[in-house]
Amino acid sequence: MSAGRPLLLSYVKDIHDHALERDRDYFRQSREKLLGCTLEELASARAERLDAARAGLESVRLTLKGGAPFLSGAHPGFADYMVGGFLLWVASIATAPFLTSDDPLLDWLGRVQDLYGGLGRKSPLNAIAA
């Protein structure tokens, strides 16, 4: 999944804003040093990065086109937990949706959220799609 880096870069400022107050200075300084720009500069280029992230999820969409309910087939497996968990984590901190409302990944993410008695629906999430 080549969507990981563009998604993370799109939401670094959101991660900062969700961090504990005592951790924010360290988070900001270390990420700005690592990335070579301010968190605000990263946030200003979010739209382009989200386009790249959506394109990077195409392999996930293609896998699901085979008709199986999960990436691993009839039952959820490692890929479903890793990719689904990452996308749901992003949704927990993202202040802007990262998928479009017609994205076929939304049905799959719904199935991932329903696992373990709907545990994925019990965590507060921001809008995943717009």
At which residue positions do the language-model features occur?
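C-terminal alpha-helical interaction module
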Residues: 1-130
